[in-house]
Amino acid sequence: MEIKIATRKSPLALYQAEAVKQAIIDKHPDCICKLIPLDSEGDKDLRPIHELGGKGVFVKRLEEALVMGDADIAVHSLKDVPADLNNEFQIVATLERANPSDSIIFKESITLDQLEDKSIVATSSPRRAAQVKLFNPSLEVCPVRGNIHTRIKKLKDNEFDALVIATAALDRLQLNLENVEKIDSSVMLPAATQAIIGIEVGRDINPQKLEIIKSINHHETYFIASVERKIIKYLEGDCNSAIALICKKIKESTFEVNLRAFDHKSLKVEKIDMCFIEAELDQFYLELFNKIEDLKIKELISN
């Protein structure tokens, strides 16, 4: 059985595709897995994501490969996949979630607390930018695009003073950099599905191949991802929305959700922290969505 795996060409994307390939081979040694590296619009055009039409710019080219039969599956950083997925496609498996935190890289040996006023912190994420400004309003934020190595080079070339990057990306690429600080979740909460590798298929995938893909699914991560994606879908957030969200297991069958929503202009923030039992998921959604409406969070993030 051959499985063709569509992936973006960036070093991080190729690592993630290789991780999926290895997971398949470990469970199904007779499988032949072939990577299909592709250029996405978001990789070729380095304008701000909102000018390109939103997060989907990282997945459209891979979805085209699924439709055309050039690939059987597409591997993504799940946070790049729109929560309102086209009906032609579905996320059928995830690998185990890595560390979901963010890290900040400095040019010198300092900490986030020690960044001087007016220091420039690079990130193109409205979520990260809002939380940086809330932590220290005197800091300045500038946008940055390109793959991780490109962004780190810009830091070394003194284009800014610090750079915020997902911890999982640094870990996966084994970038043992100096002057790196993991940012505590009390300062910076991650994006929904951050650090989760997702596997997307078309609705007409070969049933045998589908079963192979489902066999590598990490069920707890998949459940957590589905919760986070459902909440993001309800919020109707887009690439300009400053939303931080994480669901995590705290004990058997019990989960906690932490939501932070920001108006990135005024820096007003609304917070929701709730726990739920897996068997009462529908009731949890009802209560959470009512709170979202009461706090007018949709209006807040659309400002």
Where do the protein language model's features map onto the residues?
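A conserved helix-loop-strand patch within extracytoplasmic ligand-binding domains
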Residues: 78-79, 87-138
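Paired acidic/hydrophobic, glycine-rich loop segments that form the ligand-binding mouth/hinge
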Residues: 67, 72-77, 161-166
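Short glycine-rich anion-binding loops that position phosphate/pyrophosphate groups of nucleotides
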Residues: 78-81, 168-170
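Short, structured active-site "lid" loops
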Residues: 48-73
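Small-molecule-sensing regulatory modules
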Residues: 1-40, 45, 51, 134-303
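Extracytoplasmic loops/domains of multi-pass membrane proteins
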Residues: 57, 64-65, 81, 86, ...
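Short acidic active-site motifs
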Residues: 61-62, 111, 150-151
